Amino acid sequence: MKIDFIIPTLFRDTLDRAVNSIKKENIDHNILIHGDVKDGRGCGNRNEGLKKVIDSDWIIFLDDDDYLNEGFSKQLDNNYDVVVLRMSQDASNPFYPPKVIPRTEDSRLYSGNVGCNFAIKTSLYLKHKWLFSVTAKNPDWDFLARVLEVTNKTKVTDEIYYVAPMGGYNKVKPTGRK
C-alpha cells in the first residue's frame, strides 16, 4: 500500500513533527508539501498536492501543525472509499477544552463533525478530481461532502489517529480576530 500525504504549509516549526509522524509509520509514501499559494485557507496548496497524485492507493491530508498517531495506516481498509481518522482538537489550547471529531457519541459526517482528518481512495479521487474551494464556508467539509455524494463506503476509526493540538487557536484568537 502506498499513501500520498498532502501537507499545506505556512512553514511553521511544527512541519517537521507532521512529517516525522508519517515517517514513523514505515509505509510506502509520497509527502507532497505545498506552501506557495497564499489563499489564507490552505485550499490552493491542497489542490497543488492533488495535481501530483498519481500512483498511490490512498490520499491523506495533514496540516503542518498537526500530526498522526502510530497505527493510522492499518485503518485504511480497501472495503471503503473514505476513512475518517478520528481527531483530537485543541488539546494544547489554553482557551478551550479538547474535543474529538467525529464525536465519539456521533460518528455521522457533517460540517463541524469532521475536518481535514480523512483519507480518500486515490482511484475514487482520480475518477472525479474534486478540488478544494477557497470560497466555501468550510472547505474541508465542502470537499468531503462532494465525495460523499458518490460513495457511502465510509469508515470512522474508533481510536484517535489525527491530532490537531491547537485546533484553530494558532489561527484565530479567542476574540475571533486574527
Positions of the model-derived regions?
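Short, acidic, metal-binding catalytic loop of nucleotide-sugar glycosyltransferases
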Residues: 17-33
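Glycine-rich, basic loop-to-helix element that forms the pyrophosphate-binding segment
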Residues: 38-53
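Short beta-strand-to-loop acidic/aromatic patch adjacent to the donor-nucleotide binding site
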Residues: 56-67
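Acidic donor-binding/catalytic loop of UDP-sugar-dependent glycosyltransferases
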Residues: 66-77
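Short beta-strand-to-loop element that shapes/binds the nucleotide-sugar donor at the catalytic cleft/hinge
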Residues: 83-97
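A recurrent flexible, glycine/aromatic-enriched loop bordering the glycosyltransferase active site
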Residues: 101-120
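Acidic donor-binding loop at a coil-to-helix junction in glycosyltransferase catalytic cores
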Residues: 136-143
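Active-site donor/metal-binding and catalytic loop motifs
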Residues: 157-177
